[in-house]
Amino acid sequence: MSKHTNIPMFRIGIGYDVHRFDNINNDDSNTSITICGIKINYHKKIIAHSDGDVGLHALADAILGAVGCGSIGQHFPNTDKKWKNAESSHFVIEAQKKAQERGYIISNADIIIICEQPKIMPYALEMQHYIAQFTSIDPSFINIKATTTEKLGAIGRNEGIAAQAIVLCSQQY
């Protein structure tokens, strides 16, 4: 605990998101999915109410959890037309504002994208810098990584994509 307040100096949050892919294999070269703000050419689309960016959804969820503000689903429900096709950076920006209102900054973020395809790591650095552009997080404190499920389960059958994020929030001075 800080000497000067009753709020903890550090708080940790974890977030998770998953979305299904459509079952249509699109031969259209303009087909893409958005992960951590970066468009990636892919022959399937993500089924979602917003832009379906699992990486940014997990990040927003982690930030909200760290500062005790519930979940992304509570703040941006998929039943609200306001969020239809919304860009997920908005969710992260709003979550960061809630953290700041409670006296915290985001010190570190670690995001893992879980899918068989498409390959994520060629875009990791671009994703890291994109997230740094609209958050207070230094790019060197944003980590993007990817894994597969070794072809196990729905994600292993390439039916969808998931992400987990963990953040460390520090008390502002």
Swiss-Prot record:
Signal peptide: none annotated. It holds the Pfam family YgbB. It comes from the Bacteria. It catalyses: 4-CDP-2-C-methyl-D-erythritol 2-phosphate = 2-C-methyl-D-erythritol 2,4-cyclic diphosphate + CMP. 4-CDP-2-C-methyl-D-erythritol 2-phosphate binds at residues 17-19, 49-50, 76-80, 147-150, 157. Gene3D superfamilies: 2-C-methyl-D-erythritol 2,4-cyclodiphosphate synthase. Coiled coil: none annotated. GO terms for molecular function: 2-C-methyl-D-erythritol 2,4-cyclodiphosphate synthase activity; metal ion binding. Pathway: Isoprenoid biosynthesis; isopentenyl diphosphate biosynthesis via DXP pathway; isopentenyl diphosphate from 1-deoxy-D-xylulose 5-phosphate: step 4/6. Keywords: Isoprene biosynthesis, Lyase, Metal-binding. Binds 1 divalent metal cation per subunit. GO terms for biological process: isopentenyl diphosphate biosynthetic process, methylerythritol 4-phosphate pathway; terpenoid biosynthetic process. Belongs to the IspF family. Involved in the biosynthesis of isopentenyl diphosphate (IPP) and dimethylallyl diphosphate (DMAPP), two major building blocks of isoprenoid compounds. Catalyzes the conversion of 4-diphosphocytidyl-2-C-methyl-D-erythritol 2-phosphate (CDP-ME2P) to 2-C-methyl-D-erythritol 2,4-cyclodiphosphate (ME-CPP) with a corresponding release of cytidine 5-monophosphate (CMP). This is 2-C-methyl-D-erythritol 2,4-cyclodiphosphate synthase. It comes from Ehrlichia ruminantium (strain Welgevonden). The gene is ispF.
